[in-house]
Design a protein with these regions (language model features):
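Low-complexity, Ser/Thr/Pro/Gly-enriched N-terminal "stalk/linker" regions
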Residues: 1-57, 79-99
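Well-ordered alpha-helical segments within folded domains of soluble proteins
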Residues: 52-70, 108-111
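Aromatic-lined, polymer-binding surfaces characteristic
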Residues: 65, 90-98, 105-111
Length: 111
């Protein structure tokens, strides 16, 4: 049986035209500036090691920001994702658990 669809890496696709315009507007708008506008995804986020919100807001923010950065090949947006990813990877403990220590729920880690 042949596959109906082929798997592609995100970077194998490049937006053009209307879609590129929409993604650029997103990057230049709220998504690209959300940490300036919403404290829950700012420097005090629990997902950056701070005392703030540690549920799903940070992970969802990064889950949208990283693909946007890759689709636009935008180093400034990539730089915004780096602290989130680096902190999350560095937060892994001896038992394998990762993320904010004061929230042991798995849900925000599955984003």
């Amino acid at each position: 049986m042949t596959a109906e669809f082929a798997y592609l890496n995100l970077t194998e696709l490049r937006p053009e035209g209307w879609l590129l315009d929409q993604l650029r507007a997103q990057a230049d708008g709220i998504t690209g500036r959300l940490e300036e506008l919403w404290p829950d995804v700012g420097p005090s986020s629990g997902w950056l090691g701070g005392p703030g919100e540690c549920w799903e807001r940070g992970p969802y923010y990064v889950a949208g920001l990283l693909p946007l950065a890759e689709l636009l090949d935008d180093d400034a947006l990539r730089a915004k994702t780096a602290p989130w990813i680096e902190w999350t990877l560095a937060s892994q403990r001896d038992d394998g658990f990762f993320g904010p220590a004061h929230n042991r729920d798995w849900w925000p880690r599955m984003v």
